[in-house]
Amino acid sequence: MKKTIAAFLITIMAILPSQAQQKDIQVQKRDTFEFSFDLPIYVEQLKHELTYPLAWRNCRNMTFDVWKQKARAKVLECMMTPPKAATSFSPEVIAQEQRNGYKALKIRFNVNAYSRITAYVLVPDGKGPFPAINLLHDHGAHLYIGKEKMIKPFGVSEEVAKDAQAWAENLYEGQFVGDYLAQHGYVCFSIDAPMWGERGREEGVDRSKYDIIAGNMMMLGRDLCGFMHYDDIASTDFLSTLPYVDKDRIGCMGCSMGAYRAWMLSAMSDKIKVGAAICWMVTTDVQMSTADHKREYGGFANCLPGLRQYMDYPDIASLAAPKPMLFISGTKDHLFPVRGVKQAFSIIHGVWQSQGADDKLDTELWDIPHSCHKDAQLKSLQFFDKYLKPGTTASSITQRSKKQKSKSNK
C-alpha cells in the first residue's frame, strides 16, 4: 500500500505546481476565454483533423521498408536540426569501483560537438563481450538527478546519493534497474537527458524554467526534445564501440519518460535490437481528451513540432517493427487512461502482425500504478534474456539471483 501511495505521489508531483508557486499565482479572469484545462476549447475539432497520413495503417500502398524510410525521415525532420556530431567520442574513465559481480565505471565522452557528458557504465565480471542495455531515465518532474535514477551512483555528494536512493524506493521498488541487470550479465549504460542531473541549469533546478529553455532552443532552430533523442541515438552509437559490449546484442529500457525514450530509440536506431517500455503508451485522442479530463503533462519533454500531423504515438513506436518489443502499462496509471493504452496496443499489434512478427511483440496491462517495480524489472530481464541471450530460462535467472544474494550476505 505504501509503495502504491508513493508511486501515486510521484505522478502528482509531475502534474501539480508547488504550493509556493500556487501562492504566487494571481488569477485574473475574463468572462470569455479560448483555453480551458490547459487545452484549446476546440481541441476535439483539432483532433478530428488529425488523419495520420504517414501511419503504416494508412500507407499500405507501399512496401514496409519504403514506409519505414519515409516515416523515419519525417520523424527526423520534426526533431529539427540535430546537434553537430562529435568528431570523436574521446572516452575517458574518470572513476570506478568494484561491486557484487560487476564493476561500476564513470566515463566522460563527447555525445555531440557541444556536450561532453558523464555516463555510468556497469560491466559484469568475466570475459566479454556482453549484451548491453541503454537505460533511459524518467521525468517525474524531478530534474536534480537523471542517470542516478537508473544506476546507483558513487563518488557523489550525500545529497545526490540520498536523492537517488529515495527515487529508487518510490518508482523502482528500491531496486536500481541497472545494478539488477548487471548482476545478470548485462553491461548497463545511462546518461542524463538535457536538463537533468549534470546537464541542468547553473542557477539550480526549477521545473518552471524547462519550457522557457525549450522555447529559447526553438528560437535557435532546435528542439530540446529532439536533442534528447539525438543524444540517445548517439549514446547508443558510443555504447556499441565499447570493447566489452557485443554490438549485435544491444537493447534499451525505461519507465515513464524513459519508456517514451525507449520506444523512440528502438524506432530510430538500428543498433537497438530489443526494447522494453514501462508505463508510457497512449493515443493522442485519449491523451488530449475533454471526455477523460486528460491533457499532456510533460510539456516540451516529448514535444516534436508538427509530428502529430503525420503519425500518432503508436505509429511512431511501430517503426521499431519487427524487432522484439515489450510494453507494460498500468490500469492504475492516472497519466494514461486504459482505453487509450488499449487503442495504442491494438495499432501496434496491427503493424507487427503485418510483418509476421506478432510473436515478438508483448503488450501487457498490469494492475499497477505509474511505476517500474521489481516484477516489471524481472519481466524485462526475461524478455532481454530471450532475445539477447538465447537459451536462458526462468530457472537460470532464479539461480543467478540466489547466487548474487548469497554473495551479498557474505
What are these regions (language model features)?
Residues 212, 216-219, 234, 274-317, ...:
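Mobile cap/lid helix-loop segments that gate and shape the active-site cleft of serine hydrolases
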Residues 346-403, 410:
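C-terminal catalytic histidine-bearing segment of alpha/beta-hydrolase fold enzymes
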Residues 332-340, 370-371:
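Acidic catalytic loop of the alpha/beta-hydrolase fold
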Residues 320, 327-329:
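Short beta-strand/loop motif that positions the catalytic acidic residue
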Residues 20-103, 111, 146, 397-410:
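N-terminal targeting or regulatory segments adjacent to alpha/beta-hydrolase or S9 domains
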Residues 96-156:
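Glycine-rich active-site/cofactor-binding loop and its immediate structural neighborhood
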Residues 128, 135-230, 240-241, 286-289, ...:
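Cap/lid segment of the alpha/beta-hydrolase catalytic domain
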Residues 244-256:
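Alpha/beta-hydrolase fold nucleophile elbow
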